[in-house]
Curated annotation (Swiss-Prot):
Organism superkingdom: Bacteria
Species, as recorded: Mycobacterium tuberculosis (strain ATCC 25618 / H37Rv)
HAMAP family, alphabetized: PurE_classI
Protein name in the entry: N5-carboxyaminoimidazole ribonucleotide mutase
Sequence positions that bind substrate: 16, 19, 46
GO terms (BP aspect): 'de novo' IMP biosynthetic process
Length: 174
């Protein structure tokens, strides 16, 4: 994830390695913008002391944002947010039961004073992009890359619209 010698700026953590298929999208979004990241399994329930140590030391290690994914009870994002001054982005990971709705509700229902920015169920890619935007707020070069990314998205939509109009035109003329 992080090229040799570069300090990670974003932590991508999850409660279990089984969350990686979802959380890999966050890592991919960060990599697309050349944002160095570290990826770790940090369980709120199985390794609470390690989780608190990770969260408390994150800023000193140079992290600027933490993306935390969890399923089920999904306490990881909130507990990390309680232990760090850094922004935390929560990713509800869908499990076999309730399709991630339980995780979403757990992550968004934070008490006053302990904010967790929350993306959609399984929305780790958007979590990565949100972290990029947070970092880009103070970095004009990164902000320019974000604008270029948005322009590419708009171009894709325009191309799809043109193709749909072409196909629909054939259907309505026949």
């Amino acid at each position: 994830m992080t090229p040799a010698g570069e300090r990670p700026r974003v932590g991508v953590i999850m409660g279990s390695d089984s969350d990686w298929p979802v959380m890999a999208d966050a890592a991919a979004a960060l990599a697309e913008f050349d944002i160095p990241a570290e990826v770790r399994v940090v369980s709120a329930h199985r390794t609470p002391e390690a989780m608190f140590s990770y969260a408390r030391g994150a800023a000193e290690r140079g992290l600027e944002v933490i993306i935390a994914g969890a399923g089920g009870a999904a306490h990881l994002p909130g507990m990390v947010a309680a232990a760090t001054p850094l922004p935390v982005i929560g990713v509800p990971v869908p499990l076999g039961r309730l399709d991630g709705l339980d995780s979403l509700l757990s992550i968004v229902q934070m008490p006053a004073g302990v904010p967790v920015a929350t993306v959609s169920i399984g929305g780790a890619g958007n979590a990565g992009l949100l972290a990029v935007r947070m970092l880009g707020a103070a970095n004009p070069q990164l902000r320019a890359r974000i604008v270029a990314f948005q322009d590419r998205l708009a171009d894709v939509v325009a191309a799809k619209d043109a193709e749909l109009q072409r196909l629909a035109g054939k259907l309505t003329r026949d």
